[in-house]
């Protein structure tokens, strides 16, 4: 049965993150794509019993995506009026919830300074669309995630980075990875799980050597292929979850070679 528990051999990763939240510090989770950063944020949200509002950054991210937007609604009297619909930042601030900013280094640098007051000691924001001054309610926390060396990422502004405390989140392996597969996928065959772990080790080696992209060795992909391995041959599961996502034929062939070696 799948669950949302975050597992890491280094227990200080989760414990430190929880302590930083209790100190009201902004947390920047730094690590390769698919290493479990979002899973860590979700587990912190569950553990602290605090809902999480997520922003998925891209070059198209704008102030409305962060703060909200104006729209026309019909009120109780049947007449129309302009109202402002709060976005994830303002919702999290008003409710004292967690704000999770995923892939923060995918956003254009000029988009994020609007959050400066939210991220420093003021914990305050003046909504440029309404003029409303929003003060963060007790319990409000900010967690951001940054993918290191991923295609499309931009250098993170130093002034922005200085508003966070950084926690490195690396890939998991060995018996810890085995536990994750058992807990978060439908696969229970120990022999197959060990083969998948060895296969993943080979993928990570190729990632470090620059032969394949990081996404191919991600925990997400591993969980997906483990699920599919319960209903189809492992070779086809890998084809569906990893190989077919890649555009580069050399990367595809490198993974096919690893499949032949491990299965």
Swiss-Prot record:
It comes from the Bacteria. Belongs to the CbbQ/NirQ/NorQ/GpvN family. Keywords: ATP-binding, Nucleotide-binding. It comes from Staphylococcus saprophyticus subsp. saprophyticus (strain ATCC 15305 / DSM 20229 / NCIMB 8711 / NCTC 7292 / S-41). ATP binds at residues 31-38. This is Uncharacterized protein SSP1341. It holds the Pfam family AAA_5. SUPFAM superfamilies: P-loop containing nucleoside triphosphate hydrolases. The keyword Nucleotide-binding applies. InterPro entries: AAA+_ATPase, ATPase_dyneun-rel_AAA, CbbQ/NirQ/NorQ/GpvN, CbbQ_C, ClpA/B, P-loop_NTPase. Transmembrane segments: none annotated. GO terms for molecular function: ATP binding; ATP hydrolysis activity.
């Amino acid at each position: 049965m799948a669950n949302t528990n975050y597992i890491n051999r280094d227990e200080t990763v989760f414990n430190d993150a929880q302590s930083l939240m209790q100190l009201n510090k902004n947390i920047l989770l730094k690590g390769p794509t698919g290493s479990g950063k979002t899973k860590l944020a979700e587990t912190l949200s569950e553990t602290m019993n605090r809902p999480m509002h997520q922003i998925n950054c891209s070059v198209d991210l704008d102030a409305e995506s962060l703060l909200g937007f104006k729209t026309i609604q019909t009120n109780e009297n049947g007449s129309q009026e302009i109202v402002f619909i709060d976005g994830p930042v303002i919702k999290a601030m008003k409710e004292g919830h967690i704000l999770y900013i995923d892939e923060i280094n995918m956003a254009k640098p000029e988009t994020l300074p609007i959050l400066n007051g939210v991220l420093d000691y003021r914990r305050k924001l003046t909504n440029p669309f309404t003029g409303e001054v929003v003060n963060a309610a007790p319990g409000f926390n900010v967690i951001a995630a940054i993918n290191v060396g991923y295609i499309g990422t931009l250098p993170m502004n130093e002034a922005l980075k200085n508003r966070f405390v950084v926690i490195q989140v690396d890939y998991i392996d060995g018996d810890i990875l085995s536990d994750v597969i058992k807990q978060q996928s439908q696969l229970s065959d120990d022999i197959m799980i060990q083969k998948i772990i060895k296969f993943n080790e080979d993928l990570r080696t190729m990632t470090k050597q620059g032969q394949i992209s990081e996404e191919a060795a991600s925990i997400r992909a591993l969980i997906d292929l483990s699920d599919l391995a319960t209903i189809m041959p492992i070779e086809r599961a890998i084809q569906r979850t990893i190989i077919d996502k890649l555009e580069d034929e050399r990367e595809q062939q490198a993974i096919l070679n690893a499949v032949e070696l491990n299965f």
